Amino acid sequence: METVSVEEGLDFAPGMVSQKCLLCMCKLESGGCKPIGCRMDVGSLSCGYFQIKQPYWIDCGKPGKDWKSCSNDINCSSKCVQQYMKRYATHYRCPLNCEGFAREHNGGPNGCHSSRTLKYWELLQKIPGCKGVKFS
């Protein structure tokens, strides 16, 4: 599959999550869409552009060489997000828009329906260029 570059140097994998939505999620997760390595988050390590935890990487099909290197590679990590959404967003009948995907990413399986992921969506909407992001 072909990748789409939304900003110089950022080649997101294609899929059901729009490139704009991936960019907004990436900016929120890594403070500007950067390969920031791993850090502790709610008792376990979260890594890379999308702050992917190991169970998330396993659930997305273990793309790439390993969890940490995939998380710090923009194409591999965005492929993981796309595959995770293909697996869970449809299964849990999440809204197939940026809000549904962002909340599912933040909250895990069925996170799109959890009130605890609303704050994440509100934070994403405050990122310049991300307010009102739907599909494009």
From Swiss-Prot:
Activity over temperature: Optimum temperature is 76 degrees Celsius.
**Function of the protein:** Bacteriolytic activity against Gram-positive bacterium M.luteus and thereby probably protects against bacterial infection. Also has chitinase activity. May act as an ispopeptidase, cleaving isopeptide bonds between the side chains of Lys and Gln residues in proteins or in the cross-linking peptide of peptidoglycan in bacterial cell walls.
> What keywords are annotated for this sequence in UniProt?
Antibiotic, Antimicrobial, Bacteriolytic enzyme, Disulfide bond, Glycoprotein, Glycosidase, Hydrolase, Secreted, Signal
Q: How is its activity regulated?
A: Chitinase activity is activated by high salt concentrations which cause the release of the monomer from the autoinhibited homodimer.
Q: Where in the cell is it found?
A: Secreted
The pH dependence is: Optimum pH is 4-5 at 40 degrees Celsius for chitinase activity.
Give the signal sequence positions. Answer: 1-11
- What Gene3D superfamilies does UniProt report for this protein, alphabetically? 1.10.530.10
Instruction: Specify the protein name.
Output: Invertebrate-type lysozyme
Question: To which species is this protein native?
Answer: Ruditapes philippinarum (Japanese carpet shell)
Record's catalysed reaction(s): Hydrolysis of (1->4)-beta-linkages between N-acetylmuramic acid and N-acetyl-D-glucosamine residues in a peptidoglycan and between N-acetyl-D-glucosamine residues in chitodextrins
